């Protein structure tokens, strides 16, 4: 398999192995850098604005040590009935989140940002998805949490893994957005930056 060569260094600003795996699908060379940013929502900030701001902040954090690179940043926020569902961080919070959203619809906002640090230009896109969760029993929730431990996933939903079994149906323009990196939008952005994928 031959990988495409690109003129600028391409960097994925993420610690997520799932975003890295998604980007590898495009068969282009890239490096990974973990952006160390505060992901706390700002007071009064809407969930979609939070996602866009954090995706952009990740690219800027990486750009500080990688001048001249094309930097990809992404962030995802889940919302249920106007409430932002963050990363649960532990078993108890994950149980509560999944009990709250079982049988219900949750909106996921996945923001994508491509920062050209050589030209100081940014391209950004917000890709919304709606997910209807199955009406899960407490036993099913417990089984899922024991097997997957999705404590660092928005809404306790590790959709790139066993979390797919929690879904009754989903609506959205890009299925990869739910995993955290909307590849359809990314291909368009990279093409505009002169990176040929195919």
Swiss-Prot record:
Localisation per UniProt entry: Cytoplasm
- Principal localization reads cytoplasm
Q: What is the name of the protein in this document?
A: 7-methyl-GTP pyrophosphatase
Q: Name one GO biological process term.
A: nucleotide metabolic process
* CDD domains xrefs: Maf
Give GO MF terms, alphabetically.
Answer: nucleoside triphosphate diphosphatase activity
Q: Which organism is it from?
A: Nitrosospira multiformis (strain ATCC 25196 / NCIMB 11849 / C 71)
Which cofactors does this protein require?
a divalent metal cation
Q: Does the keyword NADP apply?
A: no
Q: Which UniProt keywords apply?
A: Cytoplasm, Hydrolase, Nucleotide metabolism
In this chain, the site described as Important for substrate specificity is at 18, 76, 160
EC numbers for this chain = 3.6.1.-
Question: Which family, according to the similarity comment?
Answer: Belongs to the Maf family. YceF subfamily.
């Amino acid at each position: 398999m031959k990988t495409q060569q690109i003129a600028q260094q391409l960097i994925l600003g993420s610690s997520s192995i799932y975003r890295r795996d998604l980007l590898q699908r495009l068969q282009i060379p890239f490096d990974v850098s973990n952006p160390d940013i505060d992901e706390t929502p700002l007071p009064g900030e809407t969930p979609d604005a939070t996602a866009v701001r954090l995706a952009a902040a990740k690219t800027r954090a990486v750009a500080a040590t990688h001048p001249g690179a094309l930097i990809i940043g992404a962030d995802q926020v889940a919302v249920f009935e106007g409430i932002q569902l963050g990363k649960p961080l532990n078993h108890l919070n994950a149980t509560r989140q999944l009990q709250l959203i079982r049988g219900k619809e949750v909106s996921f906002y996945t923001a994508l940002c491509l920062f050209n640090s050589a030209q100081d230009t940014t391209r950004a896109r917000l890709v919304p998805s709606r997910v209807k969760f199955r009406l899960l029993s407490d036993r099913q929730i417990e089984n899922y949490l024991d097997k997957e431990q999705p404590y660092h996933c928005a809404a306790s939903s590790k959709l790139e893994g066993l979390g797919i079994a929690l879904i009754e149906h989903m609506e959205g323009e890009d299925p990869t957005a739910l995993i955290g990196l909307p590849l359809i939008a990314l291909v368009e952005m990279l093409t505009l930056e002169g990176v040929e994928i195919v």
